[in-house]
Amino acid sequence: MNDRATAFADSRQHNRQDSAGMQEYVLQARGVTKAFVQGGFNVQVLNNTELTVRRGEKLAVVGASGSGKSTLLHVLGGLDEPSAGEVSLLGKPFTQLAERERNELRNRALGFVYQFHHLLPEFTALDNVAMPLRIRRMTTEDAREQAQTMLERVGLGPRAKHRPGELSGGERQRVAIARALVTKPACVLADEPTGNLDGTTADTVFNLMLELSETLETSFVIVTHDPDLAARCDRIMRLRDGVLHEEPALPV
């Protein structure tokens, strides 16, 4: 092979590697800025923030209260518009899509878990978990079948017919995790998912999230104040002065 052919082959191999690397990223934020007007002043919460999340990666986001962690999740999830910059989801320009396209991509590729479970109190655990599938216009029978399977994955198969008020705090949060994962999303955005639980229950719920991340190859972006839980993620980033900084790995 002559030098020109060799160079061309090397270039094609490099391009394939770059393309494969791009496909590894489930979620990316580039130059994301978010500002609010408060009391006549412009308050900048996110400042040229950069973030990448690989497939199956568990990323913890830590920072002081009021530092903008929840705002970051809202922007990453397409629930709030950035003032500048862009978010890509599965390689698509998420924040630049029309509202209908963005909603469809969000419903297909993202799951959400909050500190307070936000379950519908009048619905059973089964129907709460089935709800995202029903929104996708899946039949009631098929949606309930898949919801039952996911409830069994989180150890709540026998509790499927119970309403949220009949479940413990840890059980309600496990239902919320099942609801977030039932659509098999590429990434789950979790805002203080264990913040309302006692230490033992929080550890159980977090173990479940880590196990499901491994078995389902689902990425997680987890906002948490708990350094012990953060240390068990693949990476930790700290939000300070509107900018994300990579933290050194902590001993588990």
From Swiss-Prot:
Membrane topology (UniProt): Peripheral membrane protein
A biological process from GO: lipoprotein localization to outer membrane
Residues of the ABC transporter domain: 27-252
Cell location: Cell inner membrane
Enzyme Commission number, as recorded: 7.6.2.-
UniProt keyword Lipid metabolism present: no
UniProt region (Disordered), positions on chain: 1-20
Molecular functions per Gene Ontology: ATP binding; ATP hydrolysis activity; transmembrane transporter activity
Keywords tagged on the record: ATP-binding, Cell inner membrane, Cell membrane, Membrane, Nucleotide-binding, Translocase, Transport
Single GO cellular component term: plasma membrane
Major localization class: membrane
Family: Belongs to the ABC transporter superfamily. Lipoprotein translocase (TC 3.A.1.125) family.
Protein name: Lipoprotein-releasing system ATP-binding protein LolD
Protein species of origin: Burkholderia lata (strain ATCC 17760 / DSM 23089 / LMG 22485 / NCIMB 9086 / R18194 / 383)
Taxonomic lineage: Bacteria, Pseudomonadati, Pseudomonadota, Betaproteobacteria, Burkholderiales
